[in-house]
């Protein structure tokens, strides 16, 4: 559906607002890419950005593998190497990314990211009297502090040191918004090995990433991530091109329906796989999957009880409809996950 390419959609509005910031503040225009194929190789998704072989994100429980060598990209960083090799030095990449995850109001198996990347030549940092890493880090922080002000207005900010495989040093920018601290950007100075591999051994660079839904939910007061996928005119008609931060007005609040499922788990069971089964059957009607009880008996067998919340954004669900979905969930959970229903 490429929601980020729709100028009147909250994600498209946010993307264009970020474009506006970079176009206004940088004479060296950033090349923009928002239509790159989400099918990438394992090498592109992990190896090219130095993700360790034993990193949890490589797991079949966390990533959508099409085959052993191909995945649906987990992040827009998967295109970093190819863009560098093609001669790009300033670029923004926006696209849909895919991760196996929990089910709740802020998580969805597909969401949207934007990555920014900027390369510097030695003359730039040598003229400043700083070393390359310090120069890139200072420029990065100035850039993202300006972007945060552009999107959120005058807000209190703080920098937090963190870890990413592909940057060193690595940071997160947090803003104080609506009476709490919120992480808005993950970023850092690009690992030199990435630049060396892509024909830029004498350069330094910075990179940042952001989740469009995460920011748009706050800016537009959108309470549930599933709403971004709604074609209901009561949702889509509330937003206009160029109108950043228009507050969403809930058009209805249909009641949820709760169903519990209990089963004995095996050693290979993961909650992400359970959520994948539920989404595969209920789709957007699955609002949340929550572990509400677990215990281990005297024989060492462990039982989990999950509560599934079903709710439509657009209509009331019938008891027969929910009972049918729950029956299918029970069947598929038992057959696909090889657990024993209680």
Positions of the model-derived regions?
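Conserved short secondary-structure elements within globular domains
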Residues: 89-99, 152-157, 287-292
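Beta-rich nucleic-acid/ligand-interaction surfaces
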Residues: 32-58, 153-178, 293-299
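Amphipathic alpha-helical segments
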Residues: 13-26, 137-152, 273-280
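A carboxyl-terminal module marker
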Residues: 160-342
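Short histidine-centered catalytic/ligand-binding loop motif
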Residues: 2-7, 115-137, 259-267, 318
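Prokaryote-biased recognition of long, low-complexity C-terminal linker/tail segments
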Residues: 53-66, 75-98, 104, 109, ...
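Class II aminoacyl-tRNA synthetase-like tRNA-binding/catalytic domains
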Residues: 1-113, 119, 181-195, 202-204, ...
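Long mid-to-C-terminal scaffolding/interaction modules that assemble large complexes
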Residues: 91, 109, 113-114, 118-124, ...
């Amino acid at each position: 559906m490429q929601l980020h390419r729709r100028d009147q959609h909250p994600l498209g509005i946010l993307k264009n607002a970020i474009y506006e910031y970079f176009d206004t503040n940088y004479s060296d225009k950033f090349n923009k890419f928002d239509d790159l194929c989400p099918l990438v190789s394992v090498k592109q998704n992990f190896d090219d950005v130095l993700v360790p072989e034993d990193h949890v994100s490589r797991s079949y429980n966390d990533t959508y593998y099409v085959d052993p060598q191909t995945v649906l990209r987990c992040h827009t960083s998967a295109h970093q190497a190819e863009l560098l090799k093609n001669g790009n030095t300033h670029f923004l990449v926006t696209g849909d990314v895919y991760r196996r995850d929990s089910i709740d109001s802020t998580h969805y198996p597909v969401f949207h990211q934007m990555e920014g990347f900027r390369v510097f030549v030695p003359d730039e940092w040598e003229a400043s009297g700083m070393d390359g890493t310090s120069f890139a880090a200072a420029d990065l922080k100035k850039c993202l502090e300006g972007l945060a002000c552009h999107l959120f207005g005058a807000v209190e900010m703080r920098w937090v040191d963190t870890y990413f495989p592909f940057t060193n040093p690595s940071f997160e920018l947090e803003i104080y918004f609506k009476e709490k601290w919120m992480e808005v950007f993950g970023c850092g100075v690009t690992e030199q090995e990435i630049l060396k591999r892509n024909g830029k051994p004498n350069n330094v660079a910075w990179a940042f990433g952001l989740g469009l839904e995460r920011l748009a939910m706050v800016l537009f007061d959108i309470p549930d991530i599933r709403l971004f996928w709604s074609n209901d005119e009561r949702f889509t008609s509330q937003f206009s091109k160029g109108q950043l931060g228009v507050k969403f007005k809930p058009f209805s609040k249909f009641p949820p329906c709760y169903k519990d499922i209990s089963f004995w788990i095996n050693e290979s069971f993961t909650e992400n796989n359970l959520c994948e089964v539920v989404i595969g059957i209920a789709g957007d009607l699955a609002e949340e999957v929550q572990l509400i009880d677990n215990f281990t008996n005297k024989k060492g067998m462990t039982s989990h009880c999950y509560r599934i919340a079903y709710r439509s954004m657009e209509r009331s669900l019938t008891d027969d409809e929910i009972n049918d979905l729950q029956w299918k969930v029970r069947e598929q959970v038992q057959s696909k996950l090889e657990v024993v229903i209680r």
